[in-house]
């Protein structure tokens, strides 16, 4: 197997391709990406057989910004007959040496309007395909979360990639997309960005500790309160910094303080802030530096923020801003964890998370 399939947002294939090319080169795996604009996926072809498995094992999936899912492709099948789609897939896999026995199956499509028309078929096809795979010993008799995940990705009727991912190094979500419901009482749809970020960046078993009731947060560029809403509903208190008006529903909770000042000049009176969150429409380098300052001063322990992307050179801008921010923290002797992701609810932006591991006094 020498192909790696990556899902991404439609229109960001170039950025996803540049990223997998860089990661593969760092591991001394050489190849090239195949892509078409607005298809929602990238296929990376390694020059050497067997190196696809190496990539999906050794590239830390959490380090990928633009990829929603990463899997090794065993076979690409075209022109599946409508009267029997299962047999050609079973036959193709039975001829593939080294294909692992899987514990789960996901029959998916790329995230495009055209491909998503196949989702109804994918849902209906999952049960018979799973039964057939188990019958041939290609899957465990019962779901096993410790075994690889079998993926069938249909990019057109009768045309699919068949491959696998490792559960310790993939997206846990179907199609790589968390399924979140918009809360009817939220002030704006931007609230889903922050909720998704919590799902992606914060392990669920750490939510009670790191997103605890009674914590204080600061929301820069808060108006009308989509991001603030996520903190308030977790019983946190929030300094909302924006010259615009906040939603009345949030003001009435008694959990927020509204500061009508410039987000770049705001400093909390009491240095008891755990979270700094920021969704300001500003140059990404400026926002990244500001978030770094909050962390190195000890004003916040964790930061979640968006970096707005330029029309051109998006991947280069992201690399530069992330690298500069990391170096800024290192130069100030801060120990930290950092992740960045182009989330499903992001558009022309990425979301970055920093967790400070240093005990920095804010005084």
From Swiss-Prot:
Swiss-Prot/TrEMBL catalytic activity: cytidine(2498) in 23S rRNA + S-adenosyl-L-methionine = 2'-O-methylcytidine(2498) in 23S rRNA + S-adenosyl-L-homocysteine + H(+)
Catalytic center residues: 308
One GO BP: rRNA processing
UniProt EC number: 2.1.1.186
Record bears the keyword Metal-binding: no
Keywords attached to this entry: Cytoplasm, Methyltransferase, rRNA processing, S-adenosyl-L-methionine, Transferase
A GO cellular component entry from the record: cytoplasm
Subcellular location per the Swiss-Prot or TrEMBL entry: Cytoplasm
A GO term, aspect molecular function: S-adenosylmethionine-dependent methyltransferase activity
Disulfide bonds: none
Residues that coordinate or bind S-adenosyl-L-methionine: 190, 223-226, 242, 262, 279
UniProt superkingdom: Bacteria
InterPro entries xref list: RlmM_FDX (IPR040739), RlmM_THUMP-like (IPR048646), RNA_MeTrfase_FtsJ_dom (IPR002877), rRNA_MeTrfase_M (IPR011224), SAM-dependent_MTases_sf (IPR029063)
Job description of the protein: Catalyzes the 2'-O-methylation at nucleotide C2498 in 23S rRNA.
Subunit structure: Monomer.
Family the entry assigns: Belongs to the class I-like SAM-binding methyltransferase superfamily. RNA methyltransferase RlmE family. RlmM subfamily.
Protein name (Swiss-Prot/TrEMBL): Ribosomal RNA large subunit methyltransferase M
């Amino acid at each position: 197997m020498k192909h790696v399939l990556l899902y991404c947002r439609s229109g960001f294939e170039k950025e996803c391709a540049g990223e997998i090319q860089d990661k593969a080169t760092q591991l001394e795996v050489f190849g090239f990406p195949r892509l078409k604009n607005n298809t929602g996926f990238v296929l990376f072809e390694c020059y050497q057989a067997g190196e696809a498995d190496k990539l999906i094992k050794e590239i830390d999936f959490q380090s990928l910004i633009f990829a929603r899912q990463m899997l090794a492709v065993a076979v690409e099948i075209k022109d599946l007959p409508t009267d029997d789609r299962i047999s050609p897939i079973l036959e193709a896999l039975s001829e593939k040496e080294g294909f692992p026995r899987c514990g789960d199956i996901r029959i998916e499509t790329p995230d495009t309007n055209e491909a998503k028309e196949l989702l109804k078929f994918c849902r209906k096809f999952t049960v018979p395909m799973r039964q057939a795979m188990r019958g041939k010993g290609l899957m465990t008799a019962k779901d096993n979360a410790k075994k690889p995940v079998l993926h069938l990705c249909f990019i057109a009727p009768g045309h699919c990639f068949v491959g696998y991912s490792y559960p310790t190094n993939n997206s846990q979500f179907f199609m790589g997309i968390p399924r979140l419901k918009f809360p009817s009482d939220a002030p704006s749809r931007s609230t889903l960005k922050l909720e998704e970020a919590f799902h992606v960046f914060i392990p669920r078993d750490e939510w009670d500790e790191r997103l605890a009731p009674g914590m204080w947060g600061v929301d820069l560029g808060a108006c009308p309160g989509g991001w603030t809403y996520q903190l308030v509903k977790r019983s946190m208190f929030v300094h909302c910094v924006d010259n615009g008006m906040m939603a009345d529903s949030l003001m009435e909770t008694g959990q927020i303080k509204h500061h009508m000042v410039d987000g770049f000049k705001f400093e909390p009176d009491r240095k008891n802030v755990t979270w700094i969150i920021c969704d300001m429409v500003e140059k990404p380098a400026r926002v990244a530096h500001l978030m770094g300052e909050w962390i190195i001063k000890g004003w916040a322990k964790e930061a979640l923020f968006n970096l707005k992307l330029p029309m051109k050179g998006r991947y280069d801008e992201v690399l530069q801003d992330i690298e500069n921010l990391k170096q800024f923290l290192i130069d100030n002797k801060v120990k930290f964890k950092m992740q960045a992701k182009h989330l499903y609810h992001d558009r022309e932006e990425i979301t970055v998370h920093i967790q400070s591991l240093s005990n920095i006094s804010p005084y």
